């Protein structure tokens, strides 16, 4: 996430230990951090940031105000991965598919392997058919592998603890196909998997 809290399109907050760094120092710290992860975990896949629609490590990597610095940070992270592994696949992760074509055009010259998409019906549309078309377009236009990096679907709308349900209403669901039941949850995941793996570049 490159943050002390959740990173998503609405917030990409610098880790507190990096707040005093200038841009060049931040790049080096990012490189060192990713290198440490690569050495300790040896991952098969790695994301450079989480849901980076609007950038990373604000304000330095804000796409709107600092697009060139955003690309520098991403490329620096990619270099750290490539320096330690020729097999680890690099994911660039976008939330939803609205504006995804624009984003992946922006990063077209970045050396990455996989387009990662978040898909939550509540926020990103309630049609698996539309999702299928969007994933196909991304695959064809950019020639990258495709995966669903984040998703979730409830098996109940019941309030069974003291934590608020993010998805808690019928209007958040894909009905009548996928009710909030164990079977509805299972069928949603099954059909989503079918959509992704139905693409020649779909990996999961």
Residue ranges and their predicted role:
Residues 145-158, 167-204:
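Substrate-binding cleft of secreted/luminal carbohydrate-active enzymes
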Residues 44-47, 87-91, 112-116, 145-148, ...:
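Structural preference for beta-strand elements that scaffold enzyme active sites
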Residues 1, 48-50, 92-96, 117-119, ...:
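A cross-domain feature marking catalytic cores of carbohydrate-active enzymes
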Residues 2, 6-14, 157-169:
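Short, flexible, mixed-charge acidic loops at enzyme active sites
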Residues 54, 121, 153:
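Short, glycine/acidic-enriched loop or turn micro-motifs at the edges of active sites
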């Amino acid at each position: 996430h490159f943050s002390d809290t959740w990173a998503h399109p609405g917030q990409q907050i610098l880790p507190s230990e990096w707040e005093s760094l200038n841009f060049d120092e931040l790049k080096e710290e990012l490189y060192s951090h990713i290198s440490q992860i690569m050495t300790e975990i040896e991952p098969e896949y790695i994301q450079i940031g989480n849901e980076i629609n609007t950038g990373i490590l604000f304000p330095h990597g804000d796409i709107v105000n600092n697009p060139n610095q955003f690309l520098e940070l991403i490329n620096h992270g990619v270099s750290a991965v490539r320096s330690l592994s020729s097999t680890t696949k690099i994911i660039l992760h976008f939330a939803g598919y609205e504006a995804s074509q624009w984003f992946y055009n922006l990063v077209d010259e970045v050396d990455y392997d996989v387009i990662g998409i978040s898909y939550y019906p509540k926020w990103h549309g309630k049609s698996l058919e539309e999702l299928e078309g969007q994933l196909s377009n991304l695959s064809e236009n950019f020639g990258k592998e495709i995966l669903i990096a984040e998703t979730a679907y409830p098996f109940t709308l019941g309030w069974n603890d003291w934590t608020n349900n993010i998805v808690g209403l019928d209007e958040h669901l894909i009905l009548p196909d996928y009710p909030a039941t164990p079977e509805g949850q299972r069928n949603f995941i099954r059909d989503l998997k079918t959509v992704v793996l139905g693409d020649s570049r779909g990996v999961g």
